[in-house]
From Swiss-Prot:
Species, as recorded: Listeria monocytogenes serovar 1/2a (strain ATCC BAA-679 / EGD-e)
Name of the protein: Nucleoside triphosphate/diphosphate phosphatase
Keyword field: Hydrolase, Magnesium, Metal-binding
UniProt similarity note: Belongs to the Ntdp family.
Function: Has nucleoside phosphatase activity towards nucleoside triphosphates and nucleoside diphosphates.
Gene3D superfamilies: FomD-like
Enzyme Commission code(s) on record: 3.6.1.15, 3.6.1.6
Cofactor (UniProt): Mg(2+)
HAMAP family (alphabetical): Ntdp
Gene Ontology molecular functions: magnesium ion binding; nucleoside diphosphate phosphatase activity; ribonucleoside triphosphate phosphatase activity
Positions of Mg(2+) 1 binding: 87, 103, 107
Coiled-coil residues: none
Pfam families given in the database record: DUF402 (PF04167)
Active site: 23 (proton donor)
Length: 175
């Protein structure tokens, strides 16, 4: 399996269950790269939507991807605190072109005070019917919502108090 090196610039591409490209983040700096975990950082990076619309992220963020879990976490560093946006999707795959995953619509937004909300359940149900997500995928995703909720409550992984300090410092050093 190809693994990007630390300091390497990669693209992140999300797809939908039907194989169509959903969104591309053009530049993310690799901060950590192992077979199980890739952590990246970006700031004001260009994002291209499947329909061609383009926008630029507003703040620095640290991105966490794991090969064993069906979610990834984007931690956005804002003036009023850290916001985490958690995408429910497949574990990552990576090649020379990009880090890739399938986005399954469900998201969890975590606020600086620790409150969190599950988002986009209607979109998930609509796409589940349209793209015929198998029941096995639904079970995996529901289980990973539970795992992710426990990580948030237990301040594990990207939700630990030191996570942002450590990885944002490394990002500032590498960029």
């Amino acid at each position: 399996m190809y693994l990007p090196k630390e300091k390497e610039i990669i693209q992140i591409k999300s797809y939908k269950h039907n194989g169509k490209l959903h969104r591309t983040w053009k530049k993310t700096v690799v901060l950590k790269s192992t077979e199980n975990i890739i952590i990246g950082g970006n700031d004001h990076t260009l994002v291209v939507e499947a329909d061609g619309r383009k926008w630029v992220t507003r703040e620095p963020s640290i991105c966490y991807f794991h090969s064993d879990y069906w979610f990834n976490v984007i931690s956005m560093i804002r003036e009023d605190g850290i916001y985490h946006y958690c995408n429910l999707g497949t574990p990552f795959a990576v090649d020379e072109q990009a880090l890739k995953y399938i986005d399954y619509d469900l998201d969890i937004k975590v606020f600086p005070d620790g409150r969190f909300h599950l988002l986009d359940e209607g979109e998930y149900e609509q796409h589940r019917r349209q793209m015929k997500y198998p029941d096995s995928i639904d079970r995996i995703l529901r289980h990973n919502v539970d795992v992710l909720s426990h990580w948030i409550l237990d301040k594990k992984g990207p939700f630990s108090p030191d996570y942002i300090d450590i990885w944002y410092e490394k990002y500032k050093e590498y960029r």
